[in-house]
Amino acid sequence: MKEVEKNEIKRLSDRLDAIRHQQADLSLVEAADKYAELEKEKATLEAEIARLREVHSQKLSKEAQKLMKMPFQRAITKKEQADMGKLKKSVRGLVVVHPMTALGREMGLQEMTGFSKTAF
């Protein structure tokens, strides 16, 4: 579902860019009505892009909220990071979030963190 919003944002951004190029080519004196029409469409596109970006960010938040609701979470040690396969096999349903991923940045993580329904 996130891909739908992403593709729509891209399509609208491309249309907005095309409108900006059309406006640059128009003369305000000769084509004032066409310029005003493009300006109006530009405003609606900018509003729609802003709305879609908000929807896109809220979807990331839902995923982050789901992880934060999990009863157990803790930082993953360097030793555990070295043998991640063993850790994931020993803890059923473990989700590991790296701080440099979009989800990790959104959650404000400082270190690699594991989320699970069971203690680990």
UniProtKB/Swiss-Prot annotation:
What does the organism's lineage look like at the top?
Bacteria, Pseudomonadati, Pseudomonadota, Gammaproteobacteria, Enterobacterales
Q: Which organism is it from?
A: Escherichia coli (strain K12)
Q: Does the keyword Cytoplasm apply?
A: yes
Cystine bridges:
none
| InterPro entries xref list | DUF2810
What is the top-level taxon of the source organism? Bacteria
| One Pfam family, short name | DUF2810
GO cellular component terms?
cytosol
Location comes to: Cytoplasm
Q: Kindly provide the name given to this protein in its UniProt entry.
A: Uncharacterized protein YibL
List UniProt keywords, sorted A-Z: Cytoplasm
Mainly resides where?
cytoplasm
Which Gene3D superfamilies does this chain map to? Answer: Uncharacterised protein PF10928, DUF2810, UVR domain
